[in-house]
Amino acid sequence: MSDFAYPLHEECGVFGIYDRAGTEDVAAAAYSALYALQHRGQESCGIAVNDDGVITGHRDLGLVNEVFTPEVLASLSANTAHMATGHVRYATAGTRVRANAQPMIVRHGRGTMALCHNGNLTNAVELRRQLENEGAIFHGSSDTEVICYLITRNRLRMGSIETAISKTMDVLEGAYSLVIMSATKLIAVRDPRGYRPLCIGTLPGGGYVFASESCALDAVGAALLRDVEPGEIVVVDTKTGELRSIKDHCGRPDTQMCVFEFIYFARPDSVIEDSSVHEARKQAGRFLAQEHPVEADVVIGVPDSGLDAALGYSQESGIPYGIGFIKNKYIGRTFIQGSQKQRENSVRIKLNVVSSTVKGKRVVLVDDSIVRGTTSARIIKLLRDAGAAEVHFMVSAPPFKYPCYFGTDIPDQKLLVATGRTLEQINEVIGADTLGYLSNEHVVQLAKNAKCGFCTACFTGEYAVEPESVLSTDIHDRHLNDRPKDAKKLGE
């Protein structure tokens, strides 16, 4: 990632498991899965287990290994627990409170529900106001709590939780991939436009797994079955052990999966929409080589997400691939989030140049994006200080110009280096010999097997859903109609 001081962040990762055979420690399985999904959220995490219909859980601020000590994990393990859900969350600093950690457990007149959410509602302010006017009391500031209230209210009026979920989907706008656990059911839900990924796996001894990415299935020994379709509700009923699909909200022609899942967010060993993330990133590099050919001696990538695209650029161009940087694996998040002086030093501490790879050579440098531009400039300076003769910066995504309202934490639009600048002006900021971005035409062709369309609003400013709020994930910070003046709904 180009900007270590102010990186892009995915909001969350979700997981759920039903072990029909009763041979799995489902709490331990959830722990392993959350480890695999840690890249999707590092602020808080949680696990809820279903012990013979009784749902309990633990959630807190911190990384998976910090929150779930052996003692905590042991307290969640039970011989009769056949179901569990898990969640990792990223949030802005202002919302880093335990009340927003998930799974959220709700107890009501019809039972108990644990809910995990990845995404961001665009009408959360309006829905929350309506609920508050009806007497609802909120304990946190996330839109996940809004979803919980709506499902609970509908459940009290309807015969099944899946019917209540379907009714709730009628009023939700924006991005949501959910894993929900009741006393007898494990349920996966994906919004009708399919903004965030969600997949289904099968356990070798019988049972099912839901997860944001297939890498979490691999972590628990499950086999990838398929993706949850946009708009689909998938229900595992523990009374029968069967998998049922409800498709009342399926079939929208304007599916909008976040294309940045393939560019940066997802782990390269994951498969999303029948497409390898690793291969999609290599394809981005191939397209870059076709669009922006240069004469050079070596191609290198910025660890970690720039490496696959760099390999693709090398393969397409015939320019040798090299290891240009060694990444410090032990630098902590506290360092990056510290003082301004620490931010200035973060690139040099986190990355060190392999001088023998670049000294005296014309270098093609590949990264997944440029956010503010300051970190890209420092990386280029590191290469020049190590003796690189030329540095040609290639970006495996189009320029970031607009905020995201669907679950990606993008810095203030005014801080985005591409906003209001030409390609030449951006290059003046970062100081490369040449600069090339992947085109909008090619970015939607990265996952050739995908059945859904892609959201590229952060590049184009064209939103499939009317933007409602400012960038904060904190619902208190959102204001109706507060959106960029040049942002528009698709088709406008």
Which sequence ranges carry the predicted segments?
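PRPP-dependent phosphoribosyltransferase catalytic core
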Residues: 169, 184, 221-223, 227, ...
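A conserved beta-strand->alpha-helix junction
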Residues: 140, 145-148, 321-332, 427-447
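Generic beta-strand/beta-sheet core signal
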Residues: 116, 181, 189-190, 201, ...
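Short, glycine/charge-rich flexible loops or terminal/linker lids adjacent to PRPP-binding catalytic cores
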Residues: 318-363, 374, 401-407
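Flexible loop/turn segments at secondary-structure boundaries
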Residues: 92-93, 123, 187, 195-196, ...
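Phosphate/diphosphate-binding loops
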Residues: 167, 215-216, 223-224, 231-232, ...
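Secondary-structure transition/capping motifs at alpha-helix termini
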Residues: 136, 157-158, 293-297, 315-322, ...
